[in-house]
């Protein structure tokens, strides 16, 4: 296994076992499927649709353009990015030859929705999003903060210091402060996927996917939040895009 000792937000005291393309590998809580595969020396995870060229992991989260996989267990789901799948014990997945396959068995999981009204909705819990949410909360506003990653922080999770102090301490202290306000709703693993007229935003929260087979049956797997906000701050950051040229995938 290829890993750097002392780096990464992993629980190295626990080992998770998963299967990819029929082979068994191990990882740790805090891994994504992509990071666990890379640590195990697996670089090609899929193939292109037309020419069958190998596709690997090109980015660390949803900006990855090519690491598409098919999850078979705990429930079949196609066309997911390996970089966004949190590793769970017993996960079974395989690389995609361009197209996925829908589940052939009934989905027995629960799904629900919730309606929320707020003065300020902040999309993205990186440095700008955390500060925007904290500033509004200190003014007494009703705030909703959503972020699609497992933990808040964004680029701060890979930054040593901010404003003369530890970046991780800043994130932790800000999250604790936001949690102390009764009118602040902070949702991680929640993707805002639609922004419509009059401050209406739809967001999908993944509530139990990261728990794998340990997910409680009395909790919905996913929840759609229908949010009506007086103001919306989009603090999702930016990502570099690879240059397009002939054979740039070789």
Residue locations for each model-derived region?
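Beta1-alpha1 glycine-rich phosphate/pyrophosphate-binding loop at the start
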Residues: 118-180, 241-246
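Ubiquitin-like/PB1-type beta-grasp interaction modules and other compact soluble beta-rich domains
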Residues: 1-20, 26-29, 40-70
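Short, flexible coil/linker segments at domain boundaries that flank nucleotide/cofactor-interacting
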Residues: 13, 113-115, 138
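General beta-strand structural signal in soluble alpha/beta enzymes
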Residues: 27, 46-47, 145-147, 187-188, ...
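Conserved beta-strand segments of alpha/beta enzyme cores
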Residues: 43, 142, 183-185
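Short, structural beta-strand-to-alpha-helix junction motif
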Residues: 32-35
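A short acidic Gly-Thr/Ser loop motif
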Residues: 30, 124-126, 237
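FAD-binding core/adjacent interface of flavoenzyme oxidoreductases
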Residues: 50-60, 65, 71-73, 79-121, ...
